[in-house]
Regions:
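Extended, low-hydrophobicity, polar/charged segments
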Residues: 2-178
Length: 178
């Protein structure tokens, strides 16, 4: 059953409202500053965005969050989104042209060469997972992401240098004020 799509534009054209399945953020993501060298750092026991950010003294928006899904045929989908955002599964499904996606299990994640809790797009075999990057990641500089090794993360991940050829799309859930 499809959800009704609602879009409301203000008469002055300066604002709009839309349901979350289609809402587009007004935030602009532009890389700033010099791309620093990719650096592997020890992050013992830090698996969540809050744990990693706290341990390294960075804000969640300076991290990348890996989320894994599988499609109806069991194909793996690796999603990377900025750590302060959530994946909008409706947008992801629409982009992929899928009716259904489910969270992948740890075995599926490991088969692609990733480590649950420490997953990274760096080193993922693209033949084993479709990689989808949110525009928030593509437009950010020097993010902290997993290193595909327990208790380690990379600092200074930059899309375009450390990963290329992923689908870059808007798959973030729009928050109030975005």
């Amino acid at each position: 059953c499809a959800l009704p799509i609602s879009i409301f534009l203000s008469p002055d054209g300066k604002s709009y409202k839309a349901n979350r399945e289609i809402a587009v953020s007004g935030l602009k993501f532009e890389k700033s500053g010099e791309e620093l060298p990719l650096e592997k750092v020890h992050t013992p026991g830090c698996k969540t965005i809050d744990e990693v950010a706290g341990f390294l003294g960075v804000k969640p928006e300076n991290t990348g969050k890996a989320v894994f899904y599988s499609d109806e045929k069991g194909n793996l989908i690796f999603v990377l989104i900025r750590g302060d955002f959530e994946v909008n599964e409706s947008k992801l499904q629409n982009h992929l042209g899928l009716l259904e996606i489910n969270f992948a299990n740890d075995e599926q994640i490991r088969k692609a060469g990733a480590v649950p809790g420490y997953a990274s797009p760096v080193g993922i075999d693209p033949s084993k997972a479709r990689i989808v990057i949110d525009k928030s990641v593509a437009g950010s500089s020097n993010l902290v992401v997993g290193a595909n090794e327990a208790d380690y993360h990379y600092k200074n991940f930059n899309y375009g240098r450390d990963l290329k050829d992923a689908d870059v799309v808007d798959i973030a859930t729009v928050r109030n004020g975005d």
